[in-house]
A protein has these predicted regions:
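Solvent-exposed loop/turn segments at secondary-structure junctions
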Residues: 185-188, 226-230, 284-288, 304-306, ...
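Fold-level signature of zinc-dependent metallopeptidase catalytic domains
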Residues: 153-211, 222-232
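Bacterial Sec-dependent N-terminal signal peptides
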Residues: 1-22
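Beta-strand-enriched, solvent-exposed domains that form extended recognition/catalytic surfaces
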Residues: 27-152
């Protein structure tokens, strides 16, 4: 009887565990960049392959090739043509997916560039790009093609000669989070300022937990991407600058929303750098920024709230954290399907009384938790978040993902950041 029971346990364990993908079996040391174009409206979208570029060494994880996170609005996955195995996946969001929630997307079709990096396979692979369906909350295939690493049309030309500075090196990239800062709106004469700004941003990052305790898990790089003119576009003030990333305020007609709409330009800027995460420092005193998961983070260089905005936007772009505020103006409409759980680790729709961080809540904490200052510092379920005052909930009374006044991240966001760092480092 004991032998029979042990056999059953072993069988169940085998089916419950995912086989680890051997990096060296399927991939070489290089990185490929897929330049894509996403086009459509709020109701439909299509993806087109523009070009493939051979870049430097792959700097991402080599131990968890299939991402453990069900994050983002899109997933890119690689399947071996030889044996059918799923050998790589990662997820991301995009400015295009945000635009599809605006009023404009109901009136006109638009196209946005989107570049995705993958490890270079040794043999042919099937590339499957999936979208998260609003109706179900699940991923569904959107675009597929076969990639042959021996294809002579894969570009190998140098796209720029921007200098890459090593700011902090704590070890091999495959065991670290490689964060690259890129200059936007800095002329050649302003590169000394950019280097000082990078050092300041690095100080901001490691001044707050959990990054402060995890500094040894990061490598930091800086790309001296030179612009012809200083600053950035401010369209509603009729200010236009010739800059390397073509960034601008007034994205989706929101004054503070600072982005670089042409994602391909940003990808080209950092083509010679190792990176897991990209952060663009924009040379301006005007308040604004943006952060999009596994896409980029971007914000102003010289404002009294530069530190707070940087840490907030990096929370979006690196850890997939959602916005916990609900009172500021945004252009989005119907961002979340309230019948399903949001993918962001710090938001919940509380359907059926379920929520992601239940294990972190004290049994004496009332659920839902009243929005009262006496519950500050308590992990709970507070109504209001994700741009909506009703039916979307956040885990804390205040947090860096809610306001610039919060002293730091709440325990739920801290846990999510730590898990993302672990993914890249372990």
């Amino acid at each position: 009887m004991k032998k029979y029971f042990l056999t059953i346990v072993l069988i169940l364990a085998a089916f419950g565990c995912k086989a680890q993908i051997s990096y060296n079996q399927y991939f070489n040391n290089d990185r490929l960049r897929l330049d894509l174009v996403f086009a459509g409206t709020n109701k439909q979208q299509r993806v087109y392959l523009e070009s493939i570029h051979h870049e430097g060494a792959w700097s991402g994880t080599r131990s968890q090739m299939v991402s453990p996170f069900d994050y983002g609005n899109y997933e890119v996955a690689l399947y071996s043509v030889a044996d059918g195995a799923k050998i790589y996946s990662n997820s991301f969001c995009s400015l295009f997916s945000e635009w599809r929630t605006t009023q404009e997307s109901k009136e006109v079709a638009k196209a946005f560039t989107n570049s995705v990096v993958i490890p270079c396979p040794k043999e042919k692979v099937k590339v499957v790009l999936s979208e998260r369906l609003f109706e179900t909350g699940k991923m569904s295939p959107l675009f597929t093609f076969t990639l042959d690493p021996e294809d002579k049309e894969i570009k190998r030309d140098s796209e720029n000669d921007f200098k890459v500075d090593e700011i902090l090196n704590n070890g091999p990239s495959e065991h670290k989070v490689d964060l690259v800062f890129a200059a936007e709106g800095y002329t050649a004469e302003e590169m000394d300022k950019f280097r000082r700004d990078v050092q300041r941003f690095v100080g901001y990052l490691f001044d707050i937990e959990p990054y402060k305790s995890r500094k040894a898990d990061f490598n930091i790089w800086a790309v001296e991407s030179v612009s012809v003119e200083s600053g950035t576009d401010i369209p509603h003030n009729d200010i236009w600058k010739n800059t390397v990333a073509a960034s601008n305020f007034y994205t989706f007609k929101i004054d503070r929303y600072l982005t670089a709409p042409d994602h391909k330009k940003v990808a080209q800027m950092v083509t010679n750098a190792p990176y897991d995460a990209i952060y663009v420092i924009v040379n301006t005193e005007k308040y604004g920024g943006g952060g999009i998961y596994n896409y980029y983070g971007l914000s102003m260089s010289d404002h009294p709230y530069t530190k707070e905005v940087f840490v907030h936007e990096f929370g979006h772009s690196f850890a997939g954290l959602g916005d916990e505020y609900y009172e500021s103006d945004v252009a989005y409409e119907d961002t979340y399907n309230l019948n399903y759980e949001p993918w962001e680790p710090n938001l919940t729709t509380f359907v059926g009384g379920e929520y992601k961080w239940k294990g972190m809540v004290n049994a004496k904490t009332p659920i839902p938790t009243p929005n009262e200052a006496k519950y500050a510092g308590v992990v709970g379920v507070f109504e209001g978040g994700g741009y909506s005052a009703k039916r979307i909930y956040r885990p804390s009374f205040d947090c860096r993902m809610k306001t610039n006044k919060a002293p730091g991240f709440c325990p739920v966001c801290t846990d999510a950041i730590n898990r993302m760092i672990d993914y890249y480092c372990r």
